[in-house]
């Protein structure tokens, strides 16, 4: 029975996201576990169009966008030292982390 830990990271700033992935990878490699990644996932671009003026000039509009960058890390056959190392990693405030435990047969 082989277990996997999948770590998905999301951030609006790609530099803080890359720094967080480096910290997680170095923490896992210190425990001599097998890690795959970081795998860059497709970024999501949200675009918003608003009127510049509240009442008139309908043709005058302004466009904004926000980009969500994502990375995936997969740890094969983790041991308790890996879980302990992951709990001690301190990440930036703008990085969202989702951890999934997958047990395979």
From Swiss-Prot:
One Gene Ontology cellular component annotation held by this UniProt entry:
ribonucleoprotein complex
- List where the protein spans the membrane: none
Highest taxon in the source lineage: Bacteria
The GO annotation for biological process reads:
translation
GO MF assignments: structural constituent of ribosome; tRNA binding
InterPro entries recorded for this chain?
Ribosomal_uS10 (IPR001848), Ribosomal_uS10_dom (IPR027486), Ribosomal_uS10_dom_sf (IPR036838)
Keywords of this entry: Ribonucleoprotein, Ribosomal protein
Q: Ribosomal protein: present as a keyword of the record?
A: yes
Function field: Involved in the binding of tRNA to the ribosomes.
The entry describes its oligomerization and partners as:
Part of the 30S ribosomal subunit.
Indicate the family of this protein: Belongs to the universal ribosomal protein uS10 family.
This chain belongs to the protein called Small ribosomal subunit protein uS10
Q: Which organism is it from?
A: Rickettsia peacockii (strain Rustic)
